[in-house]
Amino acid sequence: PTRRSSDLRKLSIKYILKELYAAGIEKKDILFIISNGLHPRSTEADAKAIFGEELFNEFWHTGQIISHDSEDQEHMIYLGTTHRGDPVYMNKYVFECDIPILIGHVQGNPYGGYSGGYKHSATGITNWRCIASHHVPSVMHRDDFTPVNGGSLMRNKFDEISMHMEEKMGHPFFCCDAVLDTQSRQIAIYSGYAKEMMPISWKLADKRTYVHWAEKKYDVLVFGMPQNFHYGDGMGTNPIMMMQALSAQVLRFKRVMSDNCVIICSSICNGYFHDERWPYLRELYDLFQHDHMNTLPDMNRLGEYFATNEEYIRKYRYTNAFHPFHGFSMMSCGHIAEMNTSAIYIVGAEEPGYARGMGLKTRATFEEALEDAKKKYVGQEPNILALPMTFKKAAVHLCMKDPAQDCMDEYGHRHPCCC
């Protein structure tokens, strides 16, 4: 569901088409679905960027490139529940096809360790009710979720949901994933049955992603947050999206954070919500300020109310907005920063009240924030980790140089001598 590996897609699609044509598949029987899940449905320009001019012209004008619509009830199918009772909904085009092919990438991801594989199918071609079985506080606030790892309940649910899809289809997904580096360049490409392919691709990805570097724990993390990154323009100014971004860093860096760690982050924080992209987040932010909403998990009870709001659904379907339930996924993640830090400072905010409304401290400069943190939380000689490339390049998951000092390994196994 991201466009980072578009070069892989353009190349791999051509090879896959060659194999399909050689096996007797006709062009008219091929359908491309952009697996956006609850993310904005792709525009024509998005599709052209993903597929490239040649493939776009070959398939777009015949209606053979579409974007997943999780609210198109005619083209969604309910497949029952997993053994845990999680509801499984699936794009009907994919369910009914003879050969479902997933083309994605394997890159460090705070939600379950890596993108790609069964995460792709469990989030990209389903709906909010299925996603609400794992992108929620009861899963994301468990001890096995932080720090980021590939053995959490969330990751297991991805696997279970996707395998349930395979069971009901009567055949597996064919998965083609590129392992990407810090510049989002391809390191390797793995294809085949996801259950067998994922562990192999992760073994290589681990070498780039889980970086065993730190010789000490850090009391202060310092980085900046641009306005436009990851989920789009406004990611670094919309207060709820800011919390998700902060928490994603905690998930990645928890192994090297001290118990009293604080974050100092610069953000323009100018009140730009980008209402067209996230039509519901201003309303959620306002609700968070009232009615006994003390922490973000208190908001979770409103999830179904927002997820079934017809106007917000129409904006998702027809105006390229995020689905309203996506905001609850963001808030579930957003609380993780509060759970794992002593304080978070936003510096340089133009409208600091928005940051304070999320429980963040505000100061004019890094110097002022650091002095306050020294007085209240970290002492006069804190270990400070500056991360100038944050949100500019694909992140790593920082670890202690000695793996035995990590509180948890890459696959969710806790070390008894640590946290």
Predicted regions, residues:
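Short internal beta-strands
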Residues: 27-37, 262-267, 344-348
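Mobile "lid/hinge" segments at catalytic clefts and subdomain interfaces of large enzymes
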Residues: 100, 105-108, 115-159, 163, ...
